[in-house]
């Protein structure tokens, strides 16, 4: 299992290089399953908007699959190298993933060796718990189960600055999880959690 987690994924040059350097092959050769955030619509999926966005990071268009929350079954058994979930509202994106059954599929993919790239919301979703994110993502989209996918057994404080130090310290004090802070230019690799 390999997770590459960051605050800004490809939106920050340092993070983008870190991600590319930690893939199993050149980014242009990787087959990726991209998960849009909570603002997704069926029309946006069909428009090619998401393929263009992901291609701008170096993936080849013919290697990009965009997860369709409205028709998920064709995406459950793909031959892919990477799963990529970027930023947005953590709760809204996780709700879409759960409601469509992709939560189990993502865990299965990662357990079979597919690399997970998570940026901001996507990074939080990979963790054990997202409840602390409600301070930053105000709309929880009606979620009552705040467990993440559990790929990483700890939790993250993304977009870490001195403004979030008190939150980081409080989470550490509680001692429920390992807590890692990530500034916008930072990324981490987690293997075999």
Residue ranges and their predicted role:
Residues 5, 34, 66, 118, ...:
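Structural signal for conserved beta-strand scaffold positions within catalytic alpha/beta enzyme cores
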Residues 85-86, 94-115, 122-193:
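Active-site-adjacent pocket-lining segments in enzyme domains
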Residues 1-82:
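N-terminal beta1-alpha1 cap of cysteine-dependent amidohydrolase-like domains
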Residues 8-12, 61-65, 93-96, 135, ...:
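Short, flexible loop segments at the rims of nucleotide/cofactor-binding pockets, characterized by
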Residues 41-43, 92-95:
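A generic structural signal for short coil/turn motifs at secondary-structure boundaries
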């Amino acid at each position: 299992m390999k997770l590459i987690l960051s605050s800004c994924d490809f939106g920050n040059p340092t993070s983008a290089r870190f991600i590319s350097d930690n893939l199993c092959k050149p980014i242009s050769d990787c087959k990726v399953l991209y998960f849009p955030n909570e603002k997704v619509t069926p029309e946006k999926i069909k428009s090619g908007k998401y393929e263009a966005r992901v291609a701008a990071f170096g993936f080849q268009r013919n290697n990009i699959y965009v997860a369709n929350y409205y028709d998920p079954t064709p995406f459950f058994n793909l031959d892919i190298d990477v799963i990529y979930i970027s930023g947005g509202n953590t709760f809204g994106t996780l709700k879409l993933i759960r409601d469509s059954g992709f939560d189990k599929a993502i865990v299965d993919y990662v357990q079979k060796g597919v690399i997970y790239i998570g940026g901001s919301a996507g990074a939080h979703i990979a963790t054990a718990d997202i409840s602390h994110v409600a301070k930053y993502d105000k709309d929880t989209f009606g979620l009552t189960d705040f467990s993440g996918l559990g790929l990483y057994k700890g939790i993250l404080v993304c977009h870490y600055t001195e403004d979030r130090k008190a939150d980081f310290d409080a989470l550490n004090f509680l001692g429920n999880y390992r807590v890692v802070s990530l500034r916008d230019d930072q990324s981490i690799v987690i293997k075999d959690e």
